[in-house]
């Protein structure tokens, strides 16, 4: 009983912290806050329901990892008698203001459920590939009318370069379907811009250049060997460009970077602070984690899997 009460208190503390964060930051300047429970395996259904209620009552979006890896689906079937997407739908998380991250292992029925509830998808192809999650059914979802945007997931993906994300998104689908036209450069560019804005619920403010929209613009330097033939611009941007090809950025009409010089911060200081924070994080993680991070490449994979335990992979299906 004591442990349960302690858990309830901790949940209340978390909700209070989230409420304070929303009050402080949502709608200030260009900042928009969403509620982001990690996944159905990170928190209890009870806390998930509380976060859903908070988001709905405040008119905020929800974002959570759903059916990203095969084993979360198999464990969901084992524990709840339903697949992961079916589970979050049962809890009440799906809907027009809900962003489902990854959504790799979706059955045809679940894909239809996403469409029927007008839920949104944050597709993270680089993270999915790097972590061995699988290939999300992006063309199938788009055919059903689902809004699919592009994401980076997090540091585990090893990139925040959206050009690389675009290229990976297109390439994975071509290989998966053995069809070079299943997801075109134009499709992918839409996912990175107008579709991404719809996923975020910001389509009336960002996502394209039009009268009344915020002036969010990047200037790409095409005078480079890999970009010099600048016909078929969509293909060039998706398949050849990289983040370092961006020369200048403008956000809401304000120039933040000009000729690759960031105007709003001291880059060297930020990099030094980040390096120090990384060292501190690894140090505090303990000797076992430091050991694993320092392992050489032939043994790192097996050691990580051994450390994760026998349930590291339980299999699953997206069929």
List where the protein language model places each region:
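Metal-coordinating catalytic core of metallo-dependent amide/deamination hydrolases
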Residues: 1-105, 109
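Conserved, mostly hydrophobic/aromatic
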Residues: 35, 65, 88, 100, ...
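Glycine-enriched alpha-helix->loop->beta-strand junction motifs that scaffold or abut catalytic
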Residues: 52-61, 93-96, 113-122, 143-149
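Short, acidic/turn-prone active-site loops that include or flank metal/cofactor-
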Residues: 68, 125-129, 154-156
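Histidine/acidic-residue-rich catalytic or RNA/ligand-binding cores of hydrolases
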Residues: 70-82, 110-115, 132-141, 158-174, ...
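His/Asp/Glu-enriched, well-ordered alpha-helical/loop segment
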Residues: 90-97, 139-227, 239-242
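Long hydrophobic segments that form regular secondary structure
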Residues: 106, 110-119, 124-130
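Active-site microenvironment of metallo-dependent hydrolases
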Residues: 193-319
